[in-house]
Structure formats: C-alpha cells, structure tokens
C-alpha cells in the first residue's frame, strides 16, 4: 500500500546559511498516528512546513500518498495542500470568519465546492469534533478548547490524507485535553503530531520519531523511546513526575502464555 507520507533525503538551509534539516528520511503508513518529538530548535516546524510546500528549495523528495510535492507545479500544490491539513498551535491563526460554520466552509469553498456538498462537509467536520451545536456562533465567543476543535474541523472539511497537529494539547484544561484526545483517536486519517507533551504522545501515538539538530535520531514504539532514560536525557526530553512507560517487550513478556 502506498504510504501516506514518504520523505527521502530532505535537506534544507535558511538564507543565513543555517542548516535546519540534514537528510531526513521518514515514512508514515496510511492510518498511522506518529508523534514527532524533539527539543526546541530541532527542525520539527521546518520539516512540517515542507510537507505541503510552504517551505521548499532544499534537496530531497517528499511524496504525499504517492504525489510528489513540487512547489513549481501550482495545480499539484493545491492538491497537496488539500491532502496535508495543518492545525496550528494557536487556533486563532485559523479562525477569522464571522461564524464557526463559515470558518469550516472556507477551505472547501476555495476548492470550488458549493451547495449541498459544502453543507455536508461542514456538518460532517463539526460533528466529528463535537461542535455541530455551535455552528452559528462567533469563534471568539468559544472557549480556547472549543476553538481548537473548530480549527481541527476546518482541516477535516478538506478531507485530508494527513492531519498534522502542532502542540494540540497546549493551553488545554484536563477535560478539554481528554475530549480532544478522544476526537483524535476516532478520526480515520493519518496523524503526525508535533508535541512536547510526552504523555499525550504515549496516549495517542503508538510510534514516535525524535528529531534533533535536523536529524532523525530515533524511530520506535513510543513507549520504548520514553522508557529509555539515556536517550531522553541526550535529546533534552523529560517525562513528568510519576510517569514510567513500560517498554513493549516488557509488556509482551508479562502476558500469560
């Protein structure tokens, strides 16, 4: 099966000459949920912004569901940006219309979708995130957690191949954090989650990748990475007090035969 995402040999340097990515290779299968971990300045945002062609110009190749990300091909780039939906850390960066429904309809409408199909997409996306009852409200009247769910809906309405989430649990109270996790677990899309919230990564993503100094330094089951204290220390990742993940091998051996 064609993977949702295939990145091969991706290198990128900013105009000042600082190299942000050093030959990154990453493949994400369809339907996988993968956490992208790493300290600040590791290159996580730079990598994410390459996935739909916002950043480009370096070496390497990116494919989304088999489609080459080529910023020079404007028609293809529009399809890539439909397939790769990015939910930014601050939902207010994505919500700017008078009502929730208009915000969710904005992307599909720009694709030329109208009438019943547009209404169906809006209804489906808002239902998926539990916000259908708020469709006629102004986004600024919603709580932060509700606005984040609407931001997810704006991307779901595009029917993406990959949902990219930038720090989805930040600034959420415990109930909103749990509700968002339940929503994300229910979505039938590939998920790439950029996060410093290691318990959230453990809860939602069976697999994690650690990026540091522009290189992928680890790629394994999330529990295995978080249970390796030396790996965590080396890449400035810290678990909250009291969290002790059990490696997958230990869990398997503990099962009754």
Task: Identify the role of each PLM range.
Residues 37-39:
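The feature captures the beta-strand-to-loop junction immediately N-terminal to the Walker
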Residues 116-134:
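Conserved ABC ATPase "signature" region
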Residues 215-238:
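Conserved beta-strand-loop-alpha-helix hinge in the C-terminal portion
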Residues 138-142, 146:
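Conserved ABC ATPase signature
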Residues 195-196:
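H-loop/switch region of ABC-family ATPase nucleotide-binding domains
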Residues 52:
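Helix-to-loop junction immediately C-terminal to a conserved catalytic motif
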Residues 61-79:
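ABC ATPase NBD Q-loop/coupling interface
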């Amino acid at each position: 099966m064609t993977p949702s995402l295939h990145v091969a040999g991706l290198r990128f340097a900013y105009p000042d000459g600082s190299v942000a990515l050093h030959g990154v290779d990453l493949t994400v299968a369809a339907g996988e949920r993968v956490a992208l971990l790493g300290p600040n300045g590791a290159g996580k945002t730079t990598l994410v912004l390459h996935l739909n062609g916002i950043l480009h110009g370096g070496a390497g190749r990116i494919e989304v569901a088999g489609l080459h990300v080529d910023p020079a091909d404007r028609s293809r780039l529009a399809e890539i940006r439909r397939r790769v939906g990015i939910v930014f850390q601050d939902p207010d960066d994505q919500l700017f219309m008078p009502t929730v429904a208009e915000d969710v309809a904005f992307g599909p409408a720009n694709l030329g979708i109208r009438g019943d199909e547009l209404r169906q997409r809006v209804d489906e996306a808002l239902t998926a995130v539990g916000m259908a009852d708020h469709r006629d409200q102004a986004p600024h009247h919603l709580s932060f957690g509700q606005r984040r769910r609407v931001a997810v809906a704006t991307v779901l309405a595009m029917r993406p191949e990959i949902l990219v989430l930038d720090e989805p649990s930040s600034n959420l109270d415990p109930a909103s954090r749990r509700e968002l996790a339940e929503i994300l677990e229910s979505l039938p899309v590939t998920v790439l989650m950029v996060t410093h919230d290691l318990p959230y990564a453990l809860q939602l993503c069976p697999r994690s990748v650690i990026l540091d100094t522009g290189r992928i330094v680890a790629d394994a089951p999330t529990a295995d990475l978080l249970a390796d204290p030396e790996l965590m220390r080396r890449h400035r990742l810290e678990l909250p007090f009291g969290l002790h993940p059990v490696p997958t091998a230990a869990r398997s051996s503990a099962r009754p035969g």
